[in-house]
Amino acid sequence: MANPRNEAALAELKARFAETDTVVLTEYRGLTVAQTTELRKALGFDVQYSVAKNTLVKIAANEAGIEGLDDLLTGPTAVAFIKGEAVDTAKVLKKFGEENKAFVVKGGYMDGNALTAEQVNAIAELDNRETTLAKLAGAMKGSLAKAAGLFNAPASQVARLAVALQDKKDA
């Protein structure tokens, strides 16, 4: 690999793998430049979507300690390097794939595990972090209100009992 362009591309891929939390591999065969540009815009700033040679991706991934991608690196491959919320990116990729039949999610890598295409699509079905935290906070708030009601119930029962006893003595 004496080609300086390959060496520069490999160095860039290594840096991206080092900075990335999650990686999704896709097949872009049949997409126009306009469609690819549209996808990059939809992915946003937390995702770098790049076309790279499979051999360079294999080398960079292996040197970064990422295993399990070799079987996915066949045919034309583009890599989505995700720095932020993987769920949001998976949703964008899934929606784009539904709108553009030529686009295929091959699989990926997240939290030390290789992912199949089905697993990436399953991630797209999850709620993102903010929504999950909001649901959790709502559930906790409801539970706290119930607990407060339970703690106040004996005190109000004692007060009603005292009033009933007083009424009985007065009668």
Curated annotation (Swiss-Prot):
Domain of life according to the entry: Bacteria
SUPFAM superfamilies noted in UniProt: Ribosomal protein L10-like
Listed InterPro entries: Ribosomal_uL10 (IPR001790), Ribosomal_uL10-like_sf (IPR043141), Ribosomal_uL10_bac (IPR022973), Ribosomal_uL10_bac_type (IPR047865)
One cellular-component annotation, GO: ribosome
A GO BP annotation: translation
Family: Belongs to the universal ribosomal protein uL10 family.
Purpose of the protein: Forms part of the ribosomal stalk, playing a central role in the interaction of the ribosome with GTP-bound translation factors.
Name this protein carries in UniProt: Large ribosomal subunit protein uL10
Organism: Corynebacterium glutamicum (strain R)
Gene: rplJ
